[in-house]
Amino acid sequence: MKTLEEVAKALKNTYMEHEVDEKLPLIQEIQRLKKEKNAILLGHNYMTPDVFHGVSDITGDSLYLSKVAADTDADVILFNGVHFMAETAKLMSPQKKVLIADLKAGCSLAESITRQDVIDLKQKYPGVPVVTYVNCTADVKAETDICCTSANALQVVESLESDTVIFLPDRYLAANVQNLTQKKIITHPGSCMVHEMYSAEDIELTRRQFPGVTVISHPECKTEVVDRSDYSGSTSQMSDFIRKSEAKNIFLITECSMGDNLRSEFPDRHFVSTCQVCPHMKKITLEKIRDSLLYDQYEIHLDPEVIEKGRMSVQRMLDLSFKK
């Protein structure tokens, strides 16, 4: 757990000094409640800096946080992210109390597909394996052979023996995987409301304005964006790329808070962006996190059959990605 001094130092890269001073008492209260409840707070990379740096014990992308959820010894998991992420934590630790600070923190991708959609596709393409991006509900995962994240999508697809794969629900991630594999990809018209907003023109304008800028995009973006980027990867892969790179000017094509959080880790870099905000991620606030711990709200409950089947699809992914 970071000290309040360490938190304050990290937050001063994003907030005014008086804003930091206002946040610290609430952060201190959350830290106290965490210890009382033996709770672990998992924070996705798209959390605002006060949540990301201030109260999250473990931060990262969906793949890493899924593994942490499966391995934790904490009694309570509070997921600072959106609803499908908390559901995934419940799948992987069904015996734990899993909380999310706001039940309305949804996801445009998760809302784009239903369990029945998957059943219908399986009937239309019998015997074809189904790969589902983790950005979906638990009952969709329950109809899936194996899950994937943006960090391991190609690895998962290539691991399957079939020449044809059903890949759901992100059409842009599917298209970017299709460009890297010989397998035939059958997909679904889902998309991320944040990443689909970026265009090739955004990159061209930024390159003209900042000659020599390094462009890093998320694979949920359109192919025209990914193809024009210097690198494309998951949020954790973006961080790793920057850590190993000497690039000074970086155009980060993803959700706003990712850049805000990286500024604290890389104060010597200049992040330029046409920022896109995820309204769902921004529903998670310090006040709601405090109330979640204080009142044990809002707990994730899943049908036992969904847990059994959905857990298998996530576990297959983890076994593949973290095999020893």
Curated annotation (Swiss-Prot):
Its EC number is 2.5.1.72. Its main location: cytoplasm. Pfam families: NadA. [4Fe-4S] cluster binds at residues 107, 192, 278. GO terms for cellular component: cytosol. Binds 1 [4Fe-4S] cluster per subunit. Gene3D superfamilies: NadA-like. Iminosuccinate binds at residues 44, 62, 133-135, 150, 218-220, 235. One of its GO terms (biological process) is 'de novo' NAD biosynthetic process from L-aspartate. Pathway: Cofactor biosynthesis; NAD(+) biosynthesis; quinolinate from iminoaspartate: step 1/1. Its cofactor is [4Fe-4S] cluster. It is found in: Cytoplasm. Coiled coil: none annotated. GO terms for molecular function: 4 iron, 4 sulfur cluster binding; metal ion binding; quinolinate synthetase A activity. Keywords: 4Fe-4S, Cytoplasm, Iron, Iron-sulfur, Metal-binding, Pyridine nucleotide biosynthesis, Transferase. It catalyses: iminosuccinate + dihydroxyacetone phosphate = quinolinate + phosphate + 2 H2O + H(+). Catalyzes the condensation of iminoaspartate with dihydroxyacetone phosphate to form quinolinate. Belongs to the quinolinate synthase family. Type 2 subfamily. This is Quinolinate synthase. It comes from Leptospira interrogans serogroup Icterohaemorrhagiae serovar Lai (strain 56601). The lineage of its organism: Bacteria, Pseudomonadati, Spirochaetota, Spirochaetia, Leptospirales. The gene is nadA.
